Amino acid sequence: MLGMVARSRGDHAKAVDCFQTVLAAWPEDFFLRTELGLSLLSLGEAQQATEHFRRACELTPDSESVWFNLGEALWQQARGEEAVAALQRALALEPRQIQARISLARAYAGLGRAEAAVAELREVLRLDPDNADAWYGLSLNTIFDAADTAHLQQLFARTDLPARAHCLLGFALAKALEDQHDHARAFDALREANASQRASMRVKWDAAKERRFVDAIRNTFANAVPPSPDATAGKEAILITGMPRSGSTLVEQILASHPDVEGANEISDMLQLVDAESRRRASMFPLWVAVATVEDWQRLGHEYLARTARWRASKPRFTDKNLLGWHYVGAALAMLPAARVIIVRRDPVETCLACYRHSFTDVAGFACDLDDLADYCAGFLRLTRFWLDEYPAQVFDLQYEALIADPEAVIHRMLDFCGLPFDPACLEFHKTQRAVLTPSASQVRQPLHRGSARSARYGDKLDRLRERLQDAGVQLE
C-alpha cells in the first residue's frame, strides 16, 4: 500500500524501496513484480525493470498488460526485436489493446519498418478513428492525403478534446497541411498546437533562467578546471549533442554503422551523474565545479564508465547522445579527458522551425514559442563557440548542411577526429539495422538528400524568428 501511494505521488525511489521490502517476503507475487518494475522504469532503470517484468510474465503468461510492460522496458534499452516480440504477445492476448499497438508501431518505425508501423497505426484508427497518438505517429511516418487532412481538420475543430489530444492533433494537422502544400494554414495549426502544449506544461519555460545558466557555465569553465589524472579515461566514449532536430540522430546512425561503434541512442548517464553530484554537495551545477578536485573528476569518470559498460559488451567504442549534453561538455571532459565530443549544428532558422513542428515534453519547454526558441538557439551557439575555443582537440564542430553537401569528406573528418579508420558502411548508414528511439527514425533510413529545408516555404511567417535570432547575435545566411 505504501509503495502504491508513493508511486501515485511521483516518489518512485520510495516506491521502489517499499516494493522491494514486501517482495522479499512474497517473491512470487506478480502484482508486486509489476509495480516494482513500473517504479524502476519511471526512474530510468529499464534494465532492472525488465528482470521483474520477465518474472511477472512467467508468473502470469496470459496477462497482456505484463507483456506490454516488458515490451516498453525492452524498447527503452533499444532492444528492438525483443520489444516487438513482447508487444506482439500482448496483442495476441488482447488485439484491441490500443496502447500496445501504438507502441508496436513505434518499435517498427524505430527498426526501419515504416510500412508495418503505418499499418499498425491505421489499425488503431480503425478501432478508434479519433486517436490522437495514432494520428501524430502517422505524421512521423507517412504522407497524408486529402481525406486524412479533412478528417484531421474536423477533429482539431472540436472543443471537447483533452489538452494533450488537441496538441497532438494540431501537430498532425500541420504536417497534413504541409503535405497539401498549404503552409499558411499549417503555421496556424502549429501556433495553436504549441500554445496548447505550452499551457498544459507543468513547468513553464524560463528563458532568463536559461541565459543565467549558460553564462554561469561559461564563467566557470573559463577558469582552468583540472581534469581526471587518467589521461586515457573515456577513450571509449563519443559524446554527441546539439539542439533537437538538428541532425544528431543522423550523426549517431553514421557512427553506429562503423563496425567498432555501438550506438546507444539517447542516454542520460552523464546528466544523472552531474545531478547526483549536485545533490551530494547540496550545490547546483556549475557552482560546485570550482571546488571539485582531480580525484572528484576521476571518481565521476569511473562511475560513468561503469554505468555505460553495457554499451561496450561487443564493440570497443560507443556513442552517448543527449540533447542537453551541450551544457555539460566541460564537465564531461573533466571526467573523461580522452572522450570525443561532437556538437551538431544546423541552420538556426531551420532548427527552430523543426523544433516548433514537433511535440516535446516539459524538458524542451522552449520549443513551444518562437521567441523562446530563438533565445535558446542563441545560447546554444554561444556556448558551442566557447567549447570549441576551450577544447579544440576534443570537440568537433559538425555543420549539418556541410554533411549534406559533401558527406564523404565530412564523414572522413569526423572518423579521423574520433580516431576511427574509415569504413564504407558509414556512407551506407541508411542500411544499418538497429533500433532508433527518436522521432528521426524514418529519416535516418534514407540516403542523404538536400530536401530537408522547410523554412523558405513558410515565408514571412518566420520573419519574427529571424529578427529575434539576429537581435541575439546569431548570424543568418
Predicted regions and their residues:
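Long C-terminal interaction/binding lobes of large macromolecular proteins
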Residues: 328-329
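Short, conserved active-site loop motifs that form the nucleotide-linked donor/cofactor pocket
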Residues: 261, 339, 395
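PAPS-dependent sulfotransferases, especially Golgi type II membrane carbohydrate sulfotransferases
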Residues: 136-139, 149-160, 169-237, 288-292, ...
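Short beta-strand segments
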Residues: 240-242, 253, 265, 318-322, ...
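Conserved nucleotide-binding/hydrolysis micro-motifs of P-loop NTPases
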Residues: 268-270, 348-351, 403-404
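Short linear Ser/Thr-Pro motifs
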Residues: 86, 246, 354, 439-440
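Alpha-helical solenoid repeat scaffolds of the TPR/TPR-like class and their adjacent stem/linker regions
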Residues: 1-312
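Conserved phosphate-donor/acceptor-positioning beta-strand/loop module used by diverse small-molecule
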Residues: 332-354
